[in-house]
From Swiss-Prot:
It comes from Metamycoplasma arthritidis (strain 158L3-1) (Mycoplasma arthritidis). Keywords: Ribonucleoprotein, Ribosomal protein. InterPro entries: Ribosomal_protein_uL29, Ribosomal_uL29, Ribosomal_uL29_sf. GO terms for cellular component: cytosolic large ribosomal subunit. CDD domains: Ribosomal_L29_HIP. The keyword Ribonucleoprotein applies. This is Large ribosomal subunit protein uL29. Residues 61-71 have a biased composition (Polar residues). It comes from the Bacteria. GO terms for molecular function: structural constituent of ribosome.
Length: 88
């Protein structure tokens, strides 16, 4: 899945996908260890999907924490006006 598609999903959807990818990776590693896996490159593809998903989750978390930490200019102006006694 493309990274741009992942950024549009919610965190719950991403965490569900992450769990599925990790289960698939476990299965592929087990098959590889027992010499039942013919397409070994799939392990690398699933690892990359896991990395993309984790990156999308971390970016969403970072954006939400920044929005909570940094209020917008309008909010700052409103706070200054109310502290001076002026109200919109």
């Amino acid at each position: 899945m493309q990274y741009s598609e992942l950024k549009q999903k919610s965190i719950k959807e991403l965490e569900k996908m992450l769990a599925e990818y990790r289960a698939e990776l476990f299965s592929l590693r087990f098959k590889n260890a027992t010499r039942q896996l013919d397409q070994v490159h799939k392990i690398d593809l699933v690892k990359k999907d896991i990395a993309r998903t984790l990156t999308a989750i971390n970016e969403i978390n970072r954006m939400t924490s920044q929005q909570q930490a940094n209020p917008t200019k309008e909010t700052k102006k409103a706070a200054k006006k109310t502290s001076k006694g002026e109200v919109k």
